[in-house]
Amino acid sequence: MKYGRPFLIALVLVLAASFSGQSHDPASTSSAFALQKPSAPVPLLAKGRPVGWWVVFKLNAATFPDCGDGTRGCPFGGTVKTYKDAQQYIFASSESPTLKQGSGCAGDTDTDPIGATFGQVYNGSFNYLIWNDQFYDDPVIKGCTKECGSPWGHSKGLLAWNDAGNGFVMQVSTPSWPAAGNKAHPRKTDGDSLGCIKDDDVMVSQHFFALTLNKNDVVSVLKALGNASVVTDPSNPQIVNNGGPQDIQQLVKGLGVRSSSKKFLTFNLSGGVQLISKPSKLNVPPWQMVSAILGGVSLRAATWWATPEIATTTASTTVKCWDPSLSKPGAVEIATSGIWNGKKIGLTGGASPDHNHAKIGVSLAGPKNYSIFGDMNQQGSLSGPNCASSQNGRGGLFYVVSNPTLSKSVKALITGDTAPQ
């Protein structure tokens, strides 16, 4: 069969587009790109449902035990434990910023945000970094037994990225999870599924926050982690698979050491989220520091509030454990209870089911409508004599989301009793 010149030109253009990954059909473009190069890991509400960010608040075992109608499982290793368990959860996202009840067991399915987001890394081939000050010796961290105390950072999370440097960060408040980034390098003595590990980190409330990152954001997060002295081991493939752009690789290699920094860092990430990094040697009360960095905004925070407690403060409270690099903080209320679905929930620290290990905060007034997801508890000292006490003497990260709908929803969750001044 004989073809004319216009047809041959068109055929050449179609073939060229196919090999270059370009097409006028968006679905074809996506398929061609996927064949050439793995897409970036992203926050997922469920398998196949990417979002810019999500936040999960796992409820406590006293008020919302077990998984509701869900059945507990161990998709990332381990065995279902018989300890006090609560894997009911509420969540919000960039797609729908109002907190709502989730279904199933948090972290154990591909239809919940935690399980779906972590699963793409654990069962995939991405680069990853895990840090946690409470690995409980699996993996073993040189110089630490069971956990790494002060002056190591009080920080936990997962960073995952592709070879172009794009990916996501997931901040967690859970001790001993996650502690293995891929099924090729599982934990040696424990599981890696919520509710299926030796430590009961699903009895009290916990929080999880995941955020989409571009390559520059990944660099910023790594600088923030280094400044905060996070606990990791770049030489151990169980928790680090280093790759991608050279500047990212170099920053990863430099982690797992204690920083000498006394300077807080702030980064404006591409998704509109602000990141704050507190170094361990900046010996100030953590949430007063956040208030000051955000312009003296008044905050309400729910953390593991336990000895040595930092009391509720007003804008006129004297804070002697302070640094000249910081402006004056606003009021910081300590939430000791909240409410969900008409039920009161405990928001203090403690070793019984009606307690809280999440670290979340919200602005109380002003135009910014901040929701804050942090690494650090309100434990330490306002005015000494030991200004390096507890969390004052440790590092950590805070993610600040400015969204009026989310802020209203978080504020409602932690509205309740307040610690005295």
Residue ranges of model-derived segments:
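Bacterial N-terminal signal peptides that target proteins for export
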Residues: 1-8
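Bacterial N-terminal signal peptides
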Residues: 9-17
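PLD/PLD-like phosphodiesterase catalytic module centered on the HKD motif
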Residues: 18-421
